[in-house]
Amino acid sequence: MCASVKYNIRGPALIPRMKTKHRIYYITLFSIVLLGLIATGMFQFWPHSIESSNDWNVEKRSIRDVPVVRLPADSPIPERGDLSCRMHTCFDVYRCGFNPKNKIKVYIYALKKYVDDFGVSVSNTISREYNELLMAISDSDYYTDDINRACLFVPSIDVLNQNTLRIKETAQAMAQLSRWDRGTNHLLFNMLPGGPPDYNTALDVPRDRALLAGGGFSTWTYRQGYDVSIPVYSPLSAEVDLPEKGPGPRQYFLLSSQVGLHPEYREDLEALQVKHGESVLVLDKCTNLSEGVLSVRKRCHKHQVFDYPQVLQEATFCVVLRGARLGQAVLSDVLQAGCVPVVIADSYILPFSEVLDWKRASVVVPEEKMSDVYSILQSIPQRQIEEMQRQARWFWEAYFQSIKAIALATLQIINDRIYPYAAISYEEWNDPPAVKWGSVSNPLFLPLIPPQSQGFTAIVLTYDRVESLFRVITEVSKVPSLSKLLVVWNNQNKNPPEDSLWPKIRVPLKVVRTAENKLSNRFFPYDEIETEAVLAIDDDIIMLTSDELQFGYEVWREFPDRLVGYPGRLHLWDHEMNKWKYESEWTNEVSMVLTGAAFYHKYFNYLYTYKMPGDIKNWVDAHMNCEDIAMNFLVANVTGKAVIKVTPRKKFKCPECTAIDGLSLDQTHMVERSECINKFASVFGTMPLKVVEHRADPVLYKDDFPEKLKSFPNIGSL
């Protein structure tokens, strides 16, 4: 459209008036600019809050540029760490509130310089490692610069290395934090705890209820389910590039590379070397290196010099012994080399042991069994050793190789505690990428409730019933939780309708044309399926209401490993014929729900297409029947659980469809269905289907209650 323009034929008479208007315009503009400059200047010098975590950024981390806070000698000191703290006793989950993304929010305090009464600095300049840690948090989805939205608080006081700390004064500085509140919901990171002579296994700074992500916990100091055991970061991770080495036997069976070991430990190791010869290599610090050669990058055995950590890749097993501290950076080096760590450190809490299965990547040997370590390792099968080598490297890549990886893994563990229904599964924590099946998740290990925001993908299998197909699409599109609609066009002799003829719906609609007319096409793991939930529905199921479909989806969310559907069927044992029989009559029992209208997890599409036992898939395609029964067998066999029938509806025949249109009306159909059950039971070697005598209905179904107050008023009839 073009805007209409009107011209005034009395233009010359308006010239003096327009000059006056221009003069007023420029005077007004100048006044606004001047007022803006004055307001900006006043704001710069006017006292205002500086409590913004933007103030800890890189440009302001020099101690010379930050506010100075004087700590009087009598400043309050927090209590010692409360060893009885657990998440339900010392952590305030109500600060986290409802979060639709199931993500905690982390606030980083502004950087300040703390000094004592004599002006001596309490805290040193933030270390490079702590700077990287704060940067990792600030760049993550957990970060917030709004202190009022925060669930977790991280101080800008660096306590990674206790050797550099003034214990009392650091604790006093912690108590000055604006939201300290006895350390509730505060997280401290420490990798080198304790100091001479005791070398305690947890940070000695009094911290009251604060959570501690510590790098050297023992079973005596670790508050299980509250603290987080983290690795001691190895600087060599960033300095040395060790290409991944394939699993398998290596030059040395057992290697020790640590320096400064206790004499008794070294004697035991050297005794193993004498007993087992060249298969054991015990290295020590080099004493006669050329000038300029970094001793940290070299290890020696007698007069032979080895590059470190490269030498670790030449060993199958690498010893990780306790030093003055329980946690050792050598563990990270060993994992990077793909060497299986042999941890000999009684009571040591391995990093991220709350979620990582260390039995898959390491061998833990009691200190008293150190002399038997060689025979213990020899008893491990070679195939298991190779799997442990792969797992060791994977742990390093995912959780050890950078400060960022350590920080984010720590926050994820805490996040999983606060939102357990959305927690990362065991497989996601522990399985290397090669083991994971892309975006497919095993329903046996799903969170308690899948995220509702994802909704479901409806897959409609069709051939040429366009009119009823469009009616199904229109009805399904009314379901609030529908995310996408996928039409599987199974007719190779006829083109789908033109784009302009399809119903206009609120969600994406995609048509997939198949190469062959196979019933199994409905269960193919299409890339377009992005949701966990799938609704399989036939093109003649026009009777289901949006309330029925939405209720079915809600039930599936509670039971995501089940087949949740509408048409119920039963299998019976025919004593006269001595075989199984397919039953479609209404009874008190149900053992199958037909996938003409059923919800299931997309994982089962993968299993149906690639892992279906025997020749079942080909048999279904050849007979053009029973793909729904095959899916029932598959799900029941994997889960060991029964189907769930939802809503009372029992009639699903399309009133407009003729006998020619409806496959289920064929006279031989019932006989073939019985044959399918017997065929599948033979292939599976058992009868996995479970019989149940219940169904799921909305709570207020058939109650004398106003319809407008019911969540699902239109459940429909039989």
Swiss-Prot record:
What changing residue 538 to A does, per the record, is: Decreased N-acetylglucosaminyl-proteoglycan 4-beta-glucuronosyltransferase activity. Loss of glucuronosyl-N-acetylglucosaminyl-proteoglycan 4-alpha-N-acetylglucosaminyltransferase activity
What PTMs does it carry?
N-glycosylated at Asn-637.
Q: Which residues are glycosylated?
A: 288, 637
Record annotation: effect of changing residue 325 to A: Increased N-acetylglucosaminyl-proteoglycan 4-beta-glucuronosyltransferase activity. No effect on glucuronosyl-N-acetylglucosaminyl-proteoglycan 4-alpha-N-acetylglucosaminyltransferase activity
> In this UniProt entry, which cysteines form S-S bonds?
85-90, 96-151, 286-300, 318-339, 626-676
Q: What SUPFAM superfamilies would the database entry show?
A: Nucleotide-diphospho-sugar transferases (SSF53448)
Binding, a protein: 582, 584, 651, 653
* Topology within the bilayer: Single-pass type II membrane protein
Summarizing the annotation, the consequence of altering residue 585 to A is:
Decreased N-acetylglucosaminyl-proteoglycan 4-beta-glucuronosyltransferase activity. Decreased glucuronosyl-N-acetylglucosaminyl-proteoglycan 4-alpha-N-acetylglucosaminyltransferase activity
Q: GO terms for molecular function, please?
A: glucuronosyl-N-acetylglucosaminyl-proteoglycan 4-alpha-N-acetylglucosaminyltransferase activity; glucuronosyltransferase activity; glycosyltransferase activity; heparan sulfate N-acetylglucosaminyltransferase activity; metal ion binding; N-acetylglucosaminyl-proteoglycan 4-beta-glucuronosyltransferase activity; protein heterodimerization activity
Side Lumenal, residues: 47-718
One BP term from GO:
multicellular organismal-level water homeostasis
Q: Which residues lie on this side of the membrane: Cytoplasmic?
A: 1-25
Q: According to its record, what are the GO cellular component terms?
A: catalytic complex; endoplasmic reticulum; extracellular exosome; Golgi apparatus; Golgi membrane; membrane; UDP-N-acetylglucosamine transferase complex
Report keywords, A-Z. Disease variant, Disulfide bond, Endoplasmic reticulum, Epilepsy, Glycoprotein, Glycosyltransferase, Golgi apparatus, Hereditary multiple exostoses, Intellectual disability, Manganese, Membrane, Metal-binding, Secreted, Signal-anchor, Transferase, Transmembrane, Transmembrane helix, Tumor suppressor
EC annotation from Swiss-Prot or TrEMBL: 2.4.1.224
- Describe the effect of residue 576 to K: In osteochondroma
Binding of UDP-N-acetyl-alpha-D-glucosamine, residues: 465, 490, 517, 522, 538-540, 627-628, 673
The job of this chain, per UniProt, is described as: Glycosyltransferase forming with EXT1 the heterodimeric heparan sulfate polymerase which catalyzes the elongation of the heparan sulfate glycan backbone. Glycan backbone extension consists in the alternating transfer of (1->4)-beta-D-GlcA and (1->4)-alpha-D-GlcNAc residues from their respective UDP-sugar donors.
User: What is known about its subunit structure?
Assistant: Part of the heparan sulfate polymerase, a dimeric complex composed of EXT1 and EXT2. Could also form homooligomeric complexes. Interacts with NDST1. Interacts with GALNT5.
What disease is this chain connected with?
A: Hereditary multiple exostoses 2: EXT is a genetically heterogeneous bone disorder caused by genes segregating on human chromosomes 8, 11, and 19 and designated EXT1, EXT2 and EXT3 respectively. EXT is a dominantly inherited skeletal disorder primarily affecting endochondral bone during growth. The disease is characterized by formation of numerous cartilage-capped, benign bone tumors (osteocartilaginous exostoses or osteochondromas) that are often accompanied by skeletal deformities and short stature. Seizures, scoliosis, and macrocephaly/microcephaly syndrome: An autosomal recessive syndrome characterized by seizures, intellectual disability, hypotonia, scoliosis, macrocephaly, hypertelorism and renal dysfunction.
Q: Which family does it belong to?
A: Belongs to the glycosyltransferase 47 family.
User: What name does this protein carry?
Assistant: Exostosin-2
Organism (species) = Homo sapiens (Human)
Designated gene of the protein: EXT2
